[in-house]
Amino acid sequence: MKMMDANEIIQFISNSQKTTPVKVYIKGDLEGIDFGANTKSFINGQTGVLFGEWSEIDAALKANEAKIKDVVVENDRRNSAIPLLDLKNIKARIEPGAIIRDQVEIGDNAVIMMGASINIGSVIGEGTMIDMNVVLGGRATVGKNCHIGAGSVLAGVIEPPSAKPVVVEDDVVIGANCVILEGVTVGKGAVVAAGAVVTEDVPPNTVVAGTPARVIKEIDEKTKGKTEIKQELRRLNEDN
């Protein structure tokens, strides 16, 4: 797994074409109207659907106002610098409502649950579950076979670019509603108890809890049983 450099991300955002994509339902005398060179139009008689950049479509709507009877515009962003990740060919289970930006790496058989927000430059390892409403900030890196509990936040670091990102190593379990601050590394096999605020590195194979989080014990068989990762939840159809 590779981690994007902060300056690479900054340049990506700076140089990107800022877009305001829209979907427009339109009704009227539509024959012969030029909705713009980059607009995709699906016109059938006096009704149609347009997909394109708002500035281009808006200009066409204003220029042909007399011909248009009704318009409904769907729009969910303005001057957006980073598109959403194309999910179609990712070998992972990604549930509805997850927001995943471009330049995110997702390993095979990972699970991304509803409401998760994953920012540019994040890396998610094979077989890792990102539970509901988790936030992975820019450049946050999670290893293989981890579980990041519902509502947890892994702080992002894009600005300032010198800041060290959160790194969660393999086989880590993070409970619900935890906060892992920038620069923290959570060591392999560690467990972070629900609600913890982690401000310092977590040693491998330890359990931490509290605010700020402190080591409360080493991993034992009882803890392993309570925090077992279930591979059945990560299984995909064979043809996927």
From Swiss-Prot:
Q: What does this protein do?
A: Catalyzes the transfer of an acetyl group from acetyl-CoA to tetrahydrodipicolinate.
What keywords sit in the KW lines? Acyltransferase, Amino-acid biosynthesis, Diaminopimelate biosynthesis, Lysine biosynthesis, Repeat, Transferase
Q: Which NCBIfam families does this chain map to? A: DapD_Ac (TIGR03532)
Protein known as: 2,3,4,5-tetrahydropyridine-2,6-dicarboxylate N-acetyltransferase
- Any Pfam family hit: DapH_N
* Similarity comment: Belongs to the transferase hexapeptide repeat family. DapH subfamily.
Q: Does the keyword Transferase apply?
A: yes
Q: What is its EC number?
A: 2.3.1.89
A GO BP term, please? lysine biosynthetic process via diaminopimelate
UniProt lineage: Bacteria, Bacillati, Bacillota, Bacilli, Bacillales
Catalysed reaction, written as an equation: (S)-2,3,4,5-tetrahydrodipicolinate + acetyl-CoA + H2O = L-2-acetamido-6-oxoheptanedioate + CoA
